[in-house]
Amino acid sequence: MASPLKILISNDDGVFAEGIKALAHEAARRGHSVTVVCPDQERSATGHGLTLQSPIRAEQADGLFADGIRAWACTGTPSDCVKLALGKLLEAPPDLVLSGINHGPNLGSDVIYSGTVAAAMEGTLEGLPALAVSSACFDWRQFDGAAVQAMDVAESALAGGWPEGLLLNLNVPAVPPDRIGPVRWCRPGVRRYVDQFDERFDPRGRSYYWLAGEVVNDFEAAGTGPKDWPTDVAQVQGGGVALTPLQPELFWRGALPPLPIAGVSAAPDAAAARG
């Protein structure tokens, strides 16, 4: 990059996670100014939730990172962390928001639940370039390759002109750096789960439920996006890096049936909706 960037980094795995340390250290190694604001504990699958009924506390955690990296551990959600950083903790707006490296994939429909993606999306909502990055295996603990991939993609995208409202979601296969495949634009795939709840009983015989389940990657589902792009699920399964463009807008742009309600006009066709 022509000049050092001001980078804000968050995650949903918490301040002690190895993934966020690898990402922060790689960004700092390249000469960028790095600030970490992330949850003080595991906050996975919190989506875009915010803390409204209790205070949010932030404690400095510089000692957990390399020299020169400023860090705060917050009691809130990933979205809280980015909001607090942008609204109170940072002296100036960052040039880039990064989230991750997540311990596990954020592919296809998983992004709806992901705190990692939500933290990056918070940056997008504030008009900032943002990238979420995940290592596609929960047990993998070698994050250096994913950190390099994330910074390469982010720096390249910024140099090329980052469109406003674009969130990049990067998933890196869990293999050694020299075996990581090529980066490709991907469309969101479909991931479904079976046997989602495990019923258990406490010592007093009362039942409780533990969210578990087994993921089923659906390679046949059409998904969304250009059909000549692979799905992110298929790309990572094949050993490549999946880069998926996302946006906060949720408006449906396909065809709609007429509503069976008096006084409501027929739905526009797909072409009109896209216009």
Curated annotation (Swiss-Prot):
* Gene Ontology annotations for the cellular component aspect, listed alphabetically: cytoplasm
Instruction: Name the chemical reaction catalysed here.
Output: a ribonucleoside 5'-phosphate + H2O = a ribonucleoside + phosphate
* Pfam families per UniProt: SurE
Keyword check for Hydrolase:
yes
- Give the UniProt subcellular location, in the record's own words: Cytoplasm
How does the cofactor attach, per the note? Binds 1 divalent metal cation per subunit.
The UniProt annotation places a divalent metal cation binding at D12, D13, S44, N102
| UniProt EC number | 3.1.3.5
Q: Which family does it belong to?
A: Belongs to the SurE nucleotidase family.
Role: Nucleotidase that shows phosphatase activity on nucleoside 5'-monophosphates.
- What is the recorded name of this protein? 5'-nucleotidase SurE
